[in-house]
UniProtKB/Swiss-Prot annotation:
First-level EC class: hydrolase
GO molecular function: 3'-nucleotidase activity; 5'-nucleotidase activity; exopolyphosphatase activity; metal ion binding; nucleotide binding
Gene: surE
Protein name: 5'/3'-nucleotidase SurE
Cofactor(s) named in the record: a divalent metal cation
Role noted for this protein: Nucleotidase with a broad substrate specificity as it can dephosphorylate various ribo- and deoxyribonucleoside 5'-monophosphates and ribonucleoside 3'-monophosphates with highest affinity to 3'-AMP. Also hydrolyzes polyphosphate (exopolyphosphatase activity) with the preference for short-chain-length substrates (P20-25). Might be involved in the regulation of dNTP and NTP pools, and in the turnover of 3'-mononucleotides produced by numerous intracellular RNases (T1, T2, and F) during the degradation of various RNAs.
The organism of origin for this protein: Wigglesworthia glossinidia brevipalpis
EC number of the protein: 3.1.3.5, 3.1.3.6, 3.6.1.11
Stored InterPro entries: SurE, SurE-like_Pase/nucleotidase, SurE-like_sf
Co-factor binding details: Binds 1 divalent metal cation per subunit.
Keywords: Cytoplasm, Hydrolase, Metal-binding, Nucleotide-binding
Length: 250
């Protein structure tokens, strides 16, 4: 199996470094990741500026100032030969739950893989203490997948509790929960006494109802959320069509 491995924490993050080292024991892994932290870059693609890359002696590639999506795009369309069987994004040090899927570069990289016709995994650890546990879980998952491939192409957003393995209860297939955002903007001053603004802080107020990714993680289950790359709201096409027909006739 050929794996394209990327992330949004940057190529030097222990999440991608430890995972790539483990996976290279039994898979053909091409690492191509941003040169620095690109968290929160979502599905940003660089189209107005050229991208520079560096290839390390072990074959890993970094894209200077590139986004996770740039990395996956370049990897699939240029650098990776043969083409990947799977795109893996992570391991992110910090969960990507609920509304995070709209902002996360980890999820964005997996989305880009699916846009380009490949099954993709976005993998995040709910913290940074038990990274070795997360690496072992992903290793076993991909080893099983090697002999039991999916029948369809999927995007799976996988979040792993930051706990010792013995306390993780299993897997839950989940839906995205919701964060009750506090629309907080923090105004400050820079060294030149000019206004600067911070978005945050993050809220701790979540919808943790049964069946959500938040509920699974809170109860020490691995959360697996299938995502869609097609954002069309098919259920509302007829009602919206009727509204616009009335608008056009008015």
């Amino acid at each position: 199996m050929n794996i394209l491995l990327s992330n949004d924490d940057g190529i030097y993050s222990p999440g991608i470094q430890k995972l790539s080292k483990k996976l290279k024991k039994f898979l053909n892994v091409q690492v191509i990741a941003p040169s620095c932290d690109k968290s929160g870059s979502s599905s940003s693609l660089t189209i107005n500026n050229p991208l520079k890359v560096h290839k390390f002696s072990n074959g890993d590639i970094t894209v200077y100032s590139g986004t996770p999506i740039d990395c996956v795009y370049l990897g699939i369309n240029f650098f990776m030969k043969p083409k990947p069987d799977f795109v893996v994004s992570g391991i992110n040090l910090g969960a990507n739950l609920g509304d995070d899927v709209f902002y996360s570069g980890t999820v964005g990289a997996a989305m880009e893989g699916r846009y380009l016709k490949y099954s993709s995994l976005a993998i995040s650890l709910d913290g940074n203490k038990h990274l070795d546990v997360a690496v072992e879980i992903v290793y076993k998952f991909l080893k099983f997948l090697l002999n039991n491939p999916f029948r369809k192409k999927y995007i799976l957003n996988i979040n792993i509790p930051d706990s010792p393995l013995k306390y993780i209860k299993g897997f839950k297939i989940t839906k995205c929960g919701r964060k009750n955002f506090k629309n907080t903007v923090i105004k400050s001053k820079d060294s030149e006494n000019k206004n600067i603004f911070w978005i945050g802080p993050k809220t701790n107020c979540y919808n943790e109802s049964i069946g959500t990714d938040f509920h699974a993680i809170k109860n020490n289950y691995i959360s697996v959320t299938p995502l869609l790359s097609n954002l069309t709201n098919n259920k509302e096409i007829n009602s919206i069509s009727n509204w616009f027909e009335n608008f056009y006739k008015s």
